[in-house]
Amino acid sequence: MLKEYKSVQEVVGPLMIVEGVEGIKYEELVEIQTQTGEKRRGRVLEIDGDRAMIQLFEGSAGINLKDTTVRFLGKPLELGVSEDMIGRIFDGLGNPIDKGPKIIPEKRVDINGSPINPVSRDYPSEFIQTGISTIDGLNTLVRGQKLPIFSGSGLPHNNVAAQIARQAKVLGDDAKFAVVFAAMGITFEEAQFFIDDFTKTGAIDRAVLFINLANDPAIERISTPRMALTCAEYLAFEKGMHVLVILTDLTNYAEALREVSAARKEVPGRRGYPGYLYTDLSQIYERAGKIKGKPGSITQIPILTMPEDDITHPIPDLTGYITEGQIILSRELYKSGIQPPIFVIPSLSRLKDKGIGRGKTREDHADTMNQIYAGYASGREARELAVILGDTALSDADKAFAKFAENFDKEYVNQGYETNRSILETLDLGWKLLKVIPHAELKRIRTEYIDKYLADKD
């Protein structure tokens, strides 16, 4: 039996306090009917004795305390899931916004999900091709991994996100592959960019989009990634699909958490963010993975903008603790016209060695990856030295490494947002660039690989 109350005592921002309640649960869904008959939704955020704090999804403007009815629905916020969601666009609460028909759900699922038993997790080990050389060749994405992209304000992370969503695929089998894309707190122009890109390129045919705009309520922003991950879990673990989940921008999500925390008058943590920011982010990131005995998988690419390009900011800092690496976008490379401006030296995929090699990419992948990293680092050092002391201070080997670093930026990194390179094309390009380095300096590659692959590039 649904419980109704007219004992609203206080409304502060997106929060409502109701007194005299009993028998309700944390995260329970609430329906609020205003004095005009308008219905709004919320969820139970906190219970203290007979007082309940409710988070309003549509805001509190125009609510009259005396004439407002609060109805507790006895269930959490749910998403109706179906394979028909593929190819559709939804708002942050799971409502269709693409003028298509309503989804007839196969079932309704609690958006908070349930944690994967660590014992039942399967270790990520299969390669996912994104078509971007700096990721595929040097910071390989593995099926079931969570690999964030750290960007900055004004950097083209939206272009990178759209490129990955458009190009990503699983090699070696005909398994069903889908992309679940969730955007939080983005502008109308950004939303239109993503929708147009997915539609024009045909990527929408294998994608599910959840769009939360900057002028939508902050509470909806908190629900958006959970809606997306609930959809992904259904497609992966019940329909056997390999799902790539792209979440952007987690900084907007964290700002919404801070806004709600401030309204609740909680004691703030670092930079004013709530003390449970780490726990909250981990509840999102840890929903990636593979389960033993089930064919599907969830791979996550969260994208966040670092305030003032500060990688020690709480959001990227905590994200780095939870996830398995990071892809860094560089403002220096962006100003140089490099597209996409991925800076490979601080970037890292902690699981890359599990998804490369014979039978997955190619036998020479690990050796060339290590040599390219070493060569690029040496080349950047040589270029910096030349700026101070001049080219005459460089040895022949230093000059070769400097030339390699220059070519690497121009040809390997700077592939543009429309170029889709296969992993074999990426590996062959790496060998082509390594030609400028004397063979004696290729100390990280086995001789048999040099004889087999470098000879073909001469």
Curated annotation (Swiss-Prot):
BP terms from Gene Ontology: proton motive force-driven plasma membrane ATP synthesis
Gene Ontology CC terms, in alphabetical order: proton-transporting ATP synthase complex
Disulfide pattern: none
Gene3D superfamilies in alphabetical order: 3.40.50.12240
CDD domains (alphabetical): ATP-synt_V_A-type_beta_C, ATP-synt_V_A-type_beta_N, V_A-ATPase_B
PANTHER family to which the protein is assigned, alphabetical: V-TYPE PROTON ATPASE SUBUNIT B (PTHR43389:SF4)
Function: Produces ATP from ADP in the presence of a proton gradient across the membrane. The V-type beta chain is a regulatory subunit.
Protein name: V-type ATP synthase beta chain
